[in-house]
């Protein structure tokens, strides 16, 4: 975010220059100096304040540092711009406001959506829709699993709290514009659902507004809808458009024409917004430069900051209410005291797609479950009765997590990045887990590998005795990490005297919330390109069946097979999987790409890769989509012992 600030400052027309940057990271300081070469660099904020006399300090640091840094800046006589979320608690905001007034300085918050075109246009149109009677602020987003730099992102609830100010301040600002005056006692109602969905009702005078923020609602969206006695305004912040319906719309001709008017506005507005964005070469977040200009102008003229104290304060307080509600959810999912019927299990990877289901199933069958993960899950992602311990498998803390355990299920693995990441977080972590388990006296280990580590059937069926791939790097970093981890497990089991069971799941799919496996094809908007033939079978396994199988193996470890290719007992065809996909996406168009077409295209792509990246490993796309045949006999026998998979 700091780089966006540097670019936006450089783009302002109000005379302003970036004179200094403070960052404990040399990489961070250098990245800013590449944008603003004249900026002097400091390793700490205290050093910067001793060496410089800035008019404005931009605070673009982790949230837990905002209050202290803002207070230091105000005490030094600086105006302060604070990125959202501004601070964690209303009491902190009140203290900063008091200090700013005392020092005759101002505070501005990172509420840049108010300076984007949709918000500005909507404000201009407000008088045309008559007396406002309702405002709706809606925000739907998908939490990131990785940052742009490839690091593990914040957990989902913290991502929610990070973006929450946007829909909150939009609602508050429109309420303030429509009905000036203090909000009546804060939120009228506020709730946080078990999936992280926030619902709220806020009121200012006679005008009420609703707030909805969801992690699971689709499509991703962000809008404000204002309804008045003479029409409505829909400000769309995803497509950067505004659709307006001015007039009562009660006549027969209006009812017929309104959809066409809205369609024209949407198509024209979206096309224009795309053109403006590309034509201007947007280098920072939309609205950021405009907000900076307005704030700097207010400082030069001695006027009020562009974001009112009331809006900033109420935004912080509403977000604080949500933070407290989320903390309440965490209390509800705390481990319950009970008499365990099964072993004590350390589960790595217990916050992932498969791991979450395994943790729930282990707890359900009576195991004491301890999950070790690099970050704690959001409250709504925690399994009841499961203990979560934050730590890195390659660092200290693993030995402590293993204390009192009877068994380890090692399901953690790197899922992104290149060779170094998979070497560290798949292969290296696997070695650390097994050696630590042996040192802690935990002799039973279930290692979760992947079906992708096995060589091709070459006309026969792949079963538990099929050899591993000879060229471990031929299928990319992920498969290489999984394959070398399995080889390492086999070696260390003998060296350390461990009893190890290896489970190789096929592509894991959740039939209750269906997302197509990668080997089925690729979705491009509303078109799905399916590769191969409708009759091809895919080596997949139902998430629920996989979790119940792993829990059953933990409960009856001694009877578990040494190797298990975990698959659905009856493998589905691509046609069957596409039929399920179409059920959830009735507007989807399916196009088939036969293998006889893909093979020459893949050969051409390999040639281009060798020309463009000499010495690099070329990826054979046709090999990725090859059709293999699997012997599901062992999975079928286990399924019968578990009853039919749901």
Feature-to-residue mapping (PLM):
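Conserved Rossmann-fold NAD(P)-dependent oxidoreductase catalytic core, especially the SDR/UDP-sugar
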Residues: 108-110, 428-478, 501
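N-terminal Rossmann NAD(P)H-binding glycine-rich loop of SDR-like oxidoreductase domains
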Residues: 343-365
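Rossmann-like dinucleotide-binding domain that binds NAD(P)(H)
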Residues: 147-219, 225, 310, 544
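NAD(P)H-binding glycine-rich loop region in Rossmannoid oxidoreductase-like domains
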Residues: 55, 389-428, 432
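Predominantly a Rossmann-like dinucleotide-binding segment in NAD(P)-dependent oxidoreductases
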Residues: 113-184, 518-526
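Mid/C-terminal beta-alpha module of Rossmann-like enzyme folds, strongest
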Residues: 196, 226, 333-343, 549-618
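Beta-loop-alpha module in the N-terminal Rossmann-like domain of NAD(P)-dependent dehydrogenases
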Residues: 5, 36, 40-99
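C-terminal helix-rich "cap/oligomerization" subdomain common to oxidoreductases
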Residues: 56-58, 289-342
